[in-house]
């Protein structure tokens, strides 16, 4: 059964400052930051070999498992900190740094969503987790839904934030030049260079990722094959996943809910966390 949730809560994010923790892309003094150094926490960090790459992940809390997946290119586990803080109160959270991000290696394979889904499965197998919920933002949302499509027996529910139908040719993300992106937040990239295992390959990884995205076809045919319940969350002002693309995905998914957050951008949870969390919490609690 499908259900449409319209959320217009306009609550801001909590403010906390923990200067020693990793910053995330675009972070400001007003941004939420956890007390925990997500994405760089040696106390909970693990590695797993997935095909050609060592994938880094962290485990928090106890209870039913849920995988948390950050955004792509400029994304990091730290940006998902408020979700992890909330979920870890009564869930086991597996926060994965996807290949090429944070402390995970880049490898030699194209960083496709099929490959990233395989990486998620490798983590779950190492942790001996038979079935799980997944929550992802943007690139992480596409990875989560690809996992649900390719590994339905291991998927319970999926929360996909900022992700809609992506028809080949509909978006062109540029020529893959890393420098303009590096200048958007130099402090973030300087810090990332200190934890990434292959910092000298960042520009090449970035170009390879952009080339993949420019040819990506994540169409209704994929969404129609996802049997697990999916909650799509989108900001009303999302320019990366415009409303019409999310509506298209919603119509194609066999079992979907939709939450539209009024006046929110692509990272809707960064500006309207309580509104997003209310939808996520209710969805995950449903039998």
Each predicted region: which residue ranges?
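Catalytic active-site module of serine/aspartate enzymes centered on a nucleophile-bearing elbow/loop
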Residues: 263-287
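Short beta-strand/loop motif that positions the catalytic acidic residue
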Residues: 226, 232-234
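Active-site loop/oxyanion-hole signature of alpha/beta-hydrolase fold enzymes
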Residues: 95-135
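Flexible "cap/lid" loop of the alpha/beta hydrolase fold
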Residues: 142-150, 156-188
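Conserved HGGG/HGGXW glycine-rich cap/lid loop of the alpha/beta-hydrolase fold
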Residues: 49, 53-103
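Acidic catalytic loop of the alpha/beta-hydrolase fold
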Residues: 237-241, 266-267
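Catalytic histidine neighborhood in serine/cysteine hydrolases
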Residues: 251-267
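Active-site nucleophile elbow and catalytic-triad environment of alpha/beta-hydrolase enzymes
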Residues: 206-222
């Amino acid at each position: 059964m499908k259900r449409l949730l319209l959320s217009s809560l306009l609550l801001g994010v909590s403010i906390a400052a923990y200067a020693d923790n990793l910053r995330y892309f675009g972070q400001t003094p007003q941004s939420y930051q956890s007390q925990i150094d997500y994405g760089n926490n040696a106390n909970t960090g693990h590695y797993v070999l997935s095909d050609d790459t060592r994938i880094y992940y962290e485990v928090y809390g106890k209870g039913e498992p849920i995988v948390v997946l950050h955004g792509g290119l400029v994304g990091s586990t730290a940006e998902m900190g408020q979700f992890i803080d909330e979920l870890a109160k009564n869930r086991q959270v597996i926060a994965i740094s996807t290949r090429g991000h944070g402390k995970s290696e880049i490898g030699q394979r194209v960083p496709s969503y099929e490959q990233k889904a395989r990486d998620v499965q490798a983590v779950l197998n190492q942790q001996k987790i038979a079935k799980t919920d997944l929550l992802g933002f943007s690139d992480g949302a596409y990875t989560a839904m690809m996992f649900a499509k390719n590994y339905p027996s291991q998927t319970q529910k999926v929360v996909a934030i900022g992700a809609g139908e992506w028809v080949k040719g509909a978006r062109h993300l540029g020529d893959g030049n890393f420098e303009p992106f590096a200048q958007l937040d130099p402090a973030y990239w300087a810090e990332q260079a200190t934890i990434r295992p292959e910092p000298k390959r960042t520009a090449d990884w970035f170009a390879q990722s952009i080339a993949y995205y420019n040819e990506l076809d994540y169409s209704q045919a994929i969404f129609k094959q996802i049997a697990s319940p999916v909650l799509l969350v989108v900001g009303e002002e999302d320019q990366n996943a415009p409303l019409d693309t999310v509506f298209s995905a919603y119509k194609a998914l066999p079992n979907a809910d939709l939450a539209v957050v009024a006046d929110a951008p692509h990272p809707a949870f960064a500006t309207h966390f309580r509104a997003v969390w209310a939808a996520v919490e209710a969805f995950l609690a449903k039998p």
